Amino acid sequence: MKQKQIFKPASVKTPFLCVLVLAVLFTAAACKQSAGSSGGGGGYTPVPYEFAAVPAGVIPGTAPTYPMPGAQDFYKGVFIAGRTVTLSAYSIGKTEVTYNLWKDVYDWAVQPENGYRFANAGQAGSSGNGSGSEPVTKVTWNDCIIWCNAYTHKMKGEAECVYRKSSSDSTVLKNATDTAACNAAYADMAKKGFRLPTEAEWEYAARWENDHTNAEQYGSVWLTKLNSASGAKDKWDTNETKEVAWYSANSGSKTHTAAQKRANALGLYDMSGNAYEWCWDRHGAITADSETDPQGASSGTNRVKRGGRYSDPDSACTVGSRGNGNPGGTSDNTLGFRLACRP
């Protein structure tokens, strides 16, 4: 098992650090156990999925002072100058959701007694004939949030499902073809179920860099520079991108089995390249307002996608690059997702 990387601000004293280490390890173990136990007995062996724990943090934004792929705002991520983001502790998947895991949950979810409905069945990798260990693709954002509820229902019970009809109506969402309901979906972050990461959670995890290599300081934490792929030790237009990402220069125009490239400091794979990843947030301009656990724009149609894809140039696979897509209409063979959850 890959060793967890531990958050270690320079000012932390030894007794506090020991408590923090124990808390992080406990969170990781709890989330992993939840994703690896069926909750239903009967000798069922679930498809494994591992998480990395991310402790709470305060991230004061800063402007890049180094070369960037372009001057556009979409290269600059969410931790911009003048903005401070406070994040609660969470866990995030070490890999993109594979087709094997997707299909296992999908087949359970669509049984009449479980009542879930999807717009798309998903496929194995970019071709549809790939390995089951490649990321699932051809799924909309709507499909993903309904699948997250189904996975939670299957593994933890329906009560822990995150995605509900509204803040005042706790009905669990189960139908990805109900565009209006999905568009109005409410994320109950008090629940322990599986969900999409918020954009800030995604970027924080993608940029985690605790040995200060190719990183900038944001308060008490160090984050990979905006101009680099996740886990890369140099900027986008160097061979380092090939070490951590599948993209246009090395992918052969297709997805690949998860976790074949070097992981980042949190032990996360393919945060850059391979498949684009849906996030929870509505897409919109990032403002300098300080926020706690931000969830994106308050209005708008498109949802955020991050990380770039196997067909993109290196510049689109940087940790600061932001993308977006239609949540009910975008389901192509370059787009998948990974999971997050609260401890």
Question: Residues of each region from the PLM?
Answer:
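Residues embedded in well-ordered beta-strands
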Residues: 52, 195, 277, 336-338
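Functional-site microenvironments in short loops/helix caps that host divalent-cation chemistry
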Residues: 143-319
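Short, structured beta-strand segments at or near domain termini in extracellular proteins/domains
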Residues: 332-343
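A short glycine-rich, aromatic-capped structural motif
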Residues: 46-117, 135-153, 205, 273
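Short, polar loop/linker segments at the starts of domains and inter-domain junctions
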Residues: 61-87, 254-263, 315-331
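Bacterial Sec-dependent N-terminal signal peptides
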Residues: 2-4, 14-15, 19, 24-51
